[in-house]
Amino acid sequence: MKILSFDVGIKNLAYCLLDTEDLTIDDWNIINISVDPTCDHVNKGKCCDKTATKMTKDSGFKLCTSHCKIKLYKDKKLRNVPKLDNRMLSLGNQIVKKLDEKKNFMNMDVVCIENQPALKNPTMKSVQMIIYSYFLMNGKAKDIQMINARNKLKVYTGPKIECDIKETYKRNKFLAIKYCDIMIRENTHIDKKFHKLYDDSKKKDDLSDAYLQGIYYINKLND
């Protein structure tokens, strides 16, 4: 059975496609669903991916808050980047487009989506429901599960990880990253290319959440 697990985000949508046999990973990555324009400044051949707040009046070259201040653009006439007329519609269209590109997602049996609080962050809740609606309407998922974020930390059964972080949110992020790092290396059936992907990622917290949530659901199936 194939389990497709999503960690919900407004800019980064992490996913993990797992096989219940041997708990192997078929696909694991981050989808950039941001609709906000990004900074065009290039440093050492790499384009800045931060959200642009200003743009040059002459060429429309976009800059983030940090790069607006550097000497190279100091004498440029800048204006604010125009706001999207309907950001939620643009975000919804972007999510559908990105999901359509992932043909292997249609091979899943169950979709797991991290449940979002409706009042605390309504945009995140909307993203959750767009993903839910997408898989509901294509009719191929046998089940779509909303998973409480607290459950992902329940899957680790190894030695206790020492952590002196008191703030709950940061503590949970730290532990999720540690748990995931240990678990993917202990499972010898997982392709080592995913070890490298995880090690190289700047979004280990999102990748961890998607993986651990999928494992939580699989464990529930076996209870």
Regions found by a protein language model. Give the residues of each.
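Phosphate- and other anionic-substrate recognition elements at nucleic-acid/protein interfaces
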Residues: 1-223
